[in-house]
Amino acid sequence: MLKMLSFKLLLLAVALGFFEGDAKFGERNEGSGARRRRCLNGNPPKRLKRRDRRVMSQLELLSGGEILCGGFYPRVSCCLQSDSPGLGRLENKIFSATNNSECSRLLEEIQCAPCSPHSQSLFYTPERDVLDGDLALPLLCKDYCKEFFYTCRGHIPGLLQTTADEFCFYYARKDAGLCFPDFPRKQVRGPASNYLGQMEDYEKVGGISRKHKHNCLCVQEVMSGLRQPVSAVHSGDGSHRLFILEKEGYVKILTPEGELFKEPYLDIHKLVQSGIKGGDERGLLSLAFHPNYKKNGKLYVSYTTNQERWAIGPHDHILRVVEYTVSRKNPHQVDVRTARVFLEVAELHRKHLGGQLLFGPDGFLYIILGDGMITLDDMEEMDGLSDFTGSVLRLDVDTDMCNVPYSIPRSNPHFNSTNQPPEVFAHGLHDPGRCAVDRHPTDININLTILCSDSNGKNRSSARILQIIKGRDYESEPSLLEFKPFSNGPLVGGFVYRGCQSERLYGSYVFGDRNGNFLTLQQSPVTKQWQEKPLCLGASSSCRGYFSGHILGFGEDELGEVYILSSSKSMTQTHNGKLYKIVDPKRPLMPEECRVTVQPAQPLTSDCSRLCRNGYYTPTGKCCCSPGWEGDFCRIAKCEPACRHGGVCVRPNKCLCKKGYLGPQCEQVDRNVRRVTRAGILDQIIDMTSYLLDLTSYIV
C-alpha cells in the first residue's frame, strides 16, 4: 500500500503541474549526432530543476525512503508533463502480483521506463509499433530480459508461461538500439547490464558527472551447431587443438584455424547413457589428457552407462572412468579398442553425479564425484554402492603394473587408513558443478590449487566455491565463498584465466550459473583472500557478438584463454549449442605477444606404441601382453600345451604343424601322407614356411 501511495502522489504531482520543464533541453541535439530523445507522446523530455528535485525528495520521504523514478532519471525526464502517460501506463495487474523482493525491485525499475527521456525509442520500433495490451514492457537489454524472466516467472502466474528465449524474442532489443535499463544500475551480485555504449550520449548531454566504467569484456562466437556441448579441453601437445565434448557421447576437434573436423575424435555414443530432460546429468561427463600425451597418447574419459553385467543391483546407471589411447596411424582419432576400465561407481539418481577428471601439476589424476543424492539409509540398506561418493580421488596412472590400472600415491591422506578408501584425497562434496586446476598458482605455500563449485549440503538453495585441500572434509570445512545464487540456476564452475589476450582478467576464476549469469573470483595478493566480482559482458552495440542461452560448461585452450559452452534448449538431439570465447574489446583478438608456433599433431613414434600390438602399453611405456602372448613387445604367441613334433605356435593356442602331423598340438601322425626320402629338405621348407607365416601374422 505504501508503494502504491507513493506512485499516486507522483501522479498527483504531474496532474497539478508541480514540475515545469525547459523545452529547449530536449530539442538541443535533434539535429546532432546524439540519440534523438522523445517521450511516449512525441514531445521532448524536460530538465529537472532544483525545486523539482525537492518535490521528488518529499515524495521519497512520504514513500518511506523508496527511490522513485527521479532517482533513475535525475536530470532529464518525461514525467514532468501533464499530458505524459507517466507511471500509470504500466500500472496493470503484474506490478502488484508478487511479494518477491527481487522481482518487486525489477518491476519498480520497469515501471519507470515511461519516464525515460528515450521512452519513445524504448517502446516503439519499426517492427513493434503497437504495444501489447496484456503486458506493456519496454524493449529490454538481453541480459536484463533473462534476469527479469527467471526472477519473476514463478511470481507472475499466467503471464510468463513460455521459455526465456521466446519471451526475450519479443521483449528484448534485437538491433543495436537503446534498450532498458538505460540508467546505471547498482549491482549487488551478478553482471551489470550488457551495454557499453548506450549510456555515453545520455551522460554527456544530461550533464551527469558520475563516472561510468567501460570495463566490460566481450564474447566472440567461435562455433555453432553443436549438440549439448558440456566441456572443451586441450591436449597440451602444442597442436593447439580444442576438443569439444558433446553430452551424447562425441568428442570433436576444433583446429586453431577454426575448422571443425567432420569425423569425431572419439565416438562412444553407443556406450553412453545420456539424459534428455533438464536436470538429468547423465552423459559424457569429462575428458582429461595425460600430461605426457604427446608421447604416450593416453587420455581418460568419464561417462554414464548401464551395461548388462550391472543389470542386477541397486542402481539406476553406472559412472565409468576409462583410459583410451590415440590411434597409431591417425593422431585425430582415438582407437576405441584400447579401452581400459579404471573405475565404476553405481549411481541411484541422475543428479549430483560429478565425474570431472583433471591432472594436477603433481602428475596425478583427480576424479571429482558428487554424492549422487545417496542418503545414509541407502548406504546401509543396499550393498554394492560405492564408498567414493562425494569425494575427490587421487590416482597415480603412471604404473608399470599390468594387473591393476593405477596405484595409490603414498602421499594420499588415507594411504594406510582402514576407515576411508586409500584413493580418497578429500570428501564432503555434494554437487560439484565443475572443477579446475590453476596452472600458475600465486600462493607459494600451496603447490596445488583446485577450485570447485558445489551446492551447500545444509542449505541446498545456496551455493559455494571450494578450494580442494588434502584430507579436508567439506561437510564442515568453510568454503572460499558461500552465497545465495542471483537466480535459480545451479552453479557451473569454470577456469582460472591464465591467458594472454584479456590481460584484465588474468588470475581471475571465471564461473557462472546455468541461467547465463557470470562472476569472477580474484585472490588478493596481500591477504590471499578470494573476492567476488561481477563479470560484465558487452552487448552487440560494443561487441561483435553477445551471449545467449544457458551455460552448460566452460573450456580452456592451450594458451589459457577461457571459453563458454551454451545451448538454448536442454534436448541433446538439437544442434543449437554454441562455443564462445571471452575477449577484451580493447585489445586485438590475437596480440603479437600472444602468438605462438603451432605444432601439427603427429602419430606416436615411441617403440612401445609402434610394436606393442598384441597387448597394451602403460603410460610409462611398458608393454602388457594380452592373454596368449609373451616376450618383448608381446610378439611371441603361447600355445598351451606346447606344439609338438616341430610345430610352430603362430597364434594363441594355434599350432602350424609340419607335414605328416595333425591335431591342435601336432600330436597326431597323418597316416595318409606319403613319406618322402628327402624329409630333411621338406622339414627345412616347412620350417621356413612356418616362419614366414608367423612373420606375416605380426605384420598384419
Swiss-Prot record:
The keyword Cell membrane is annotated on this UniProt entry: yes
Disulfide bridge map: 216-536, 218-543, 402-624, 435-452, 500-594, 612-623, 625-634, 639-649, 643-655, 657-666
Tissues in which the protein is found: In the adult brain, high expression found in the ventral cochlear nucleus, medial habenula, indusium griseum and tenia tecta. Some expression also in the caudate putamen, the nucleus accumbens, the ventral pallidum and in the superficial layers of the superior colliculus.
Chief location of this protein within or outside the cell: membrane
GO cellular component, one term: extracellular region
Topology relative to the membrane: Peripheral membrane protein
Domain EGF-like, residue spans: 607-634, 635-667
UniProt cross-references to Gene3D superfamilies, sorted A to Z: Laminin, TolB, C-terminal domain
Binding annotation for Zn(2+): 383
Family that this chain belongs to: Belongs to the HHIP family.
Purpose: Modulates hedgehog signaling in several cell types, including brain and lung through direct interaction with members of the hedgehog family. Soluble forms inhibit Shh-induced differentiation in the fibroblast cell line C3H/10T1/2.
Listed PANTHER family: HEDGEHOG-INTERACTING PROTEIN
Quaternary state and interactors: Interacts with all three hedgehog family members, SHH, IHH and DHH.
Protein name according to UniProt: Hedgehog-interacting protein
Organism of this sequence: Mus musculus
Gene: Hhip
